[in-house]
Design a protein with these regions (language model features):
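Conserved ABC ATPase signature
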Residues: 147-151, 155
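Hydrophobic anchor residue at the start of the ABC signature
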Residues: 161
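ABC ATPase NBD coupling module
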Residues: 19-23, 63, 76-92, 110, ...
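Helix-to-loop junction immediately C-terminal to a conserved catalytic motif
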Residues: 59
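The feature captures the beta-strand-to-loop junction immediately N-terminal to the Walker
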Residues: 44-46
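Conserved ABC ATPase "signature" region
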Residues: 75, 124-142
Length: 169
């Protein structure tokens, strides 16, 4: 069996409480999960059970105060900004609500080029990649010049997926 690509071991996420001597709020208490290459996993649970918090911990957006978050064998729980930026080539997120995750004032091309620009991809290569991404998610190439509001919810979800795939994670 192959080693996990993502391995969360006893992850704890705590947030400080306001007030003198109040114990921190434990948003996650010892959560473990491993995902192997090529595996698809869905997290299911009650509202407030920590699904989003675990995702945020993996992405470095929630403070991991215990346990480990290993990506390809490296503990990424306490990576700084430069390390996170380099890691963004390998880890991307597709948000649950695609409309609020897409900037309404940018064209689809601008939205898809943004992660490529951050990684210093040449403009000509980025434009070519946009066409590939649209094709990959089943949208016509003329979608690049349109705004998010011009698409259905399902099409916006495909645009969000295309953005996540832009860097070939």
């Amino acid at each position: 069996m192959t080693a996990p690509l993502l391995d969360c071991k006893d992850v704890v996420v705590e947030y400080p409480m306001k007030g003198w001597r109040k114990p921190p709020f434990k948003a996650l208490k010892g959560v473990s999960l491993d995902i192997r290459p090529g595996e698809t996993v869905g997290l299911v649970g009650e509202s407030g059970s920590g699904k989003t918090t675990l995702g945020r911990a993996v992405l470095g957006l929630a403070p991991v105060t215990g346990g480990q978050v290993l990506f390809d064998g490296t503990d990424i729980a306490h990576f700084g900004r430069p390390q996170r930026r380099a890691l963004s080539k390998d880890i991307q997120v597709v948000f649950q609500d695609p409309y609020t995750s897409l900037n309404p004032s940018l064209t689809i091309e601008q939205i898809l080029v943004e992660p490529l620009t951050v990684q210093n991809v040449a403009k000509s290569e980025a434009s070519k990649r946009v066409r590939e991404l649209l094709d990959q998610v089943g949208l016509p190439s003329n979608a690049a010049s349109r705004l998010p509001r011009e698409f259905s919810g399902g099409q916006r979800q495909r645009i969000a997926i295309a953005r996540a795939l832009a860097l070939r994670p």
